[in-house]
Structure formats: C-alpha cells, structure tokens
C-alpha cells in the first residue's frame, strides 16, 4: 500500500507535539561509540572474496539516542557494508524482548565500507551470480556476527541510560568529495568508473546534539558516497571514507560523528586508490569531506531544546525483476499484485523533527537523482535521505539507467517502473 507521508506530515499535526497549556517536555540525548573491530581474520564484504590480513583503522557502532518526552529514538551507524532487512527485523525483535523497545524506534544504518567483515546472511546478492560471481562463496563467522549484534544491543541500552538534557540543530552544507560513477565507454557501454558530468548529490546534512552549555554530544552527518576508496585488492580492515572522515571530525569537535550514507547508488568517492592503503590521496578526504562537515557544524547559528519527534513508516510495492528468484528469509518483502505480477515490498521510514526537518530512510542503494527529486518536492526546510538503513534490497536505479544498462541495473531486483512508483509514494 502506498502511503503519502512526506507531504502529509508537513500539513498535519506532528505526532507527540505539545498541546497548548501542557508543561514543556525536556529533550534529552546521548551517544555511545562501541568498538567492533574483529580480533581474527574475517571475510570482507564487497568486491571478490578476500580474507582480512590486518587492521588499518578500527571500526565501530556509533549510537545516538534521542528522547522528546514521548518518543525515544535510536540511530545507529555501523562501519560495515550492508545487512539484510530480515537481520534488522531480528534485531528489532530482540530489542523488544530484552529492552522493551518497540520495533521501528531503532534505525540501523551501515556506512557501506567495502573493507569490513560480512555480518549476517546475504539474501539477494547470491541471486545475481551471473554479475557478482563468487563474491558470496565464503565462510560465515557467526561468532563475529553475534559479537556485533550483542555489542549493538548493549550499546543501545547504554545510550538509553545516559540520556541527558540536550539541544538539537540541523544545517546543510556542501562537499565535493564524490562523483558520478556511471562512465560511458567509447563503444557506448556504461561501466563503473568516473562520469564527471553525471548527476551527483553533494549536500552534507548535519544534525548536532549538544548539552545546554553548548558542548557537543554527537554529530550526525549525511552524505552520498560509496565506501570504495579502497579497492578490491585491499585486505586491511577499514571504515574507508566514512570511517576516515568520522575519526577526523571527532578529533576536531570532541564528540562522536555518526556517518549515515545518502543516495550513493550511482555515486563514488572522488578518488579510489585500489589496494594502496598508504596512498596520500586518502588523507584528502579529511579536507574534502571532513572539513566540510566541520564547517557546517561551525555555521550552525541556533539549536533548540524544544524538540518534537514523529516516526512514520510506509511500504512501497513495485514490480520485481522478471525471472528473479527470491528467498524464504525475504518472504515479508515480497507480494503478488492483483494481475499476478511478483512485487518487491520496500519499507520506507520517516523521522520528522519539529516542523522544519524530515528524514526519510530505506534499505536501498538509491540513485541520487531520485533522492534529489524528492528533496526538491519536499515542503520541509531540511530533507535528508538515509540510505542503506534497516537493511539492503540492493540498487534502485532511475528509469533512464535501466535503459542504459550497466552494473547497477544488472544487480537490481526492480524494474524501470521503480523510480516512478517510489517517488510518487513518498511525495504525493
């Protein structure tokens, strides 16, 4: 069922808002950073099968908790490539069972580094063996999966226990750290590469959580970029650009930075260095993106303790790629239309902050044009898209990209109707 939440939330009352005459609620926030760097070699996700041979930089869960007096919300940013929607669902079931946290109150975003371990089963990727080859023919380290999940549950509980009076602010900036990656070859083929004239989203979205005295609790930075500055020959565990940048900004501002990817489906880092983890160009991301985040933070002129949070969710149904199989674990993400066409069911989540900011999130590698079109249609002052959140259903390209071909359409479970179905569902 298609539900119109983006415009409807702008026009209607905010769920949980304070009625006239009520005592103002106290907004509270907290942040926890948990090291999940493995102690043993791990198979790295992304590219061909590779077993890690060391650690270049450590990887983390970063967990922000927010509470407006009615709604408690947790945002997680984890330095891994992807999880599947059923893996997220299992986390939600555990959080409800052990901590009493209702499903949907926790969003789990992965930064999409291609130099971190696999976590959880991979449900869709193996269906595209003709394109992806043997990259999923690896051993699963379920003990490490359990460590990652246990650490996340404990971190969420710890963040909730540390909630303190806070203020919140939102600002946007710009960074030129990314580039369209759908390169057109001389023979007309589309291949992964660099397309400098192609569409790219360079908006930096920034949320600041601070104490009443102005000292920072956490920053949340939203930017579209594949975690592929390090290539398929790298065997060192790394957070890639999101991890480099987070550590750099944390050193500058003195608080954790949650990096949440945007619509990075057709967006690459400006520089990729292959397996040369000592390439000096990697440091340039500190300037290209890290300093842009620091500048956006410095430009924030106001924060507020008067914060109201409203969570929403809808499901977009759109046709499934003809002939594509499905797995039992993804049964909740499939349906059949009245005319017998197999459908993919895509959950879309929303967080509205007061009446000026909306964040929408989906378990997708969305093409940037789609997110930018939604932003252009939004009545909110700030509209942010959180990609690869609460799982991954792989790529959702534009209709034009399906016609052009290339890597992303070849590993998409969708059809060329997906762009229109998805956009109309969240903007009308």
PLM segments and residue spans:
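Bacterial N-terminal signal peptides
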Residues: 4-14
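Conserved beta-alpha junction segments in alpha/beta enzyme cores
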Residues: 22-109, 113-258, 262-264, 270-273, ...
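Signal peptide processing junction and immediate N-terminal pro/mature segment
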Residues: 16-22
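Anionic-ligand-binding alpha/beta catalytic cores of soluble enzymes and soluble regulatory domains
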Residues: 289
């Amino acid at each position: 069922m298609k539900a119109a939440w983006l415009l409807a939330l702008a026009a209607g009352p905010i769920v949980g808002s304070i009625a006239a005459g009520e005592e103002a609620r106290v907004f509270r926030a907290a942040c926890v950073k948990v090291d999940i760097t493995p102690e043993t070699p791990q198979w790295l996700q992304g590219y061909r099968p590779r077993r890690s041979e060391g650690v270049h930089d450590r990887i983390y869960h970063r967990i922000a908790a927010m509470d407006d007096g009615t709604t408690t919300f947790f945002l997680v940013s984890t330095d891994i490539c992807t999880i599947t929607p059923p893996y997220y669902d299992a986390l939600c079931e555990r959080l409800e069972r052990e901590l009493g946290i209702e499903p949907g109150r926790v969003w789990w975003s992965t930064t999409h580094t291609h130099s971190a371990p696999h976590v959880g089963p991979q449900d869709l990727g193996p269906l595209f063996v003709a394109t992806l080859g043997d990259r999923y023919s690896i051993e699963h380290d379920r003990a490490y999966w359990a460590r990652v999940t246990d650490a996340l549950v404990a971190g969420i509980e710890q963040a909730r226990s540390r909630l303190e009076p806070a203020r919140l602010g939102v600002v946007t900036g710009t960074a030129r750290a990314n580039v369209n990656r759908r390169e057109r070859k001389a023979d007309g083929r589309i291949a992964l590469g660099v397309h400098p004239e192609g569409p790219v989203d360079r908006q930096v979205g920034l949320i600041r959580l601070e104490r009443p005295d102005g000292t920072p609790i956490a920053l949340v930075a939203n930017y579209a970029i594949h975690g592929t500055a390090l290539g398929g020959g790298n065997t060192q565990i790394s957070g890639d650009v999101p991890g480099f940048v987070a550590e750099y900004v944390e050193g500058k501002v003195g608080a954790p930075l949650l990096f949440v990817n945007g619509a990075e489906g057709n967006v690459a880092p400006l520089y990729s260095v292959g397996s040369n983890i000592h390439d000096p160009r990697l440091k340039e991301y500190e300037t290209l993106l890290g300093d842009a985040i620091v500048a956006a933070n410095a430009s924030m002129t106001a924060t507020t303790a008067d914060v109201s949070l409203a969570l929403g969710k809808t499901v977009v149904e759109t046709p499934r790629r003809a002939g594509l199989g499905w797995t039992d674990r993804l049964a909740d993400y499939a349906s059949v239309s009245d005319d017998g066409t197999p459908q993919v069911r895509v959950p879309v989540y929303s967080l509205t902050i007061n009446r000026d900011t909306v964040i929408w999130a989906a378990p997708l590698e969305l093409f940037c044009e789609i997110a930018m079109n939604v932003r252009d249609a939004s009545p909110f002052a700030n509209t942010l898209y959180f990609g690869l959140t609460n799982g991954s259903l792989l790529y959702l390209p534009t209709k034009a990209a399906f016609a052009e071909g290339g890597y992303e359409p070849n590993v998409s479970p969708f059809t060329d109707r997906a762009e229109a179905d998805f956009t109309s569902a969240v903007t009308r």
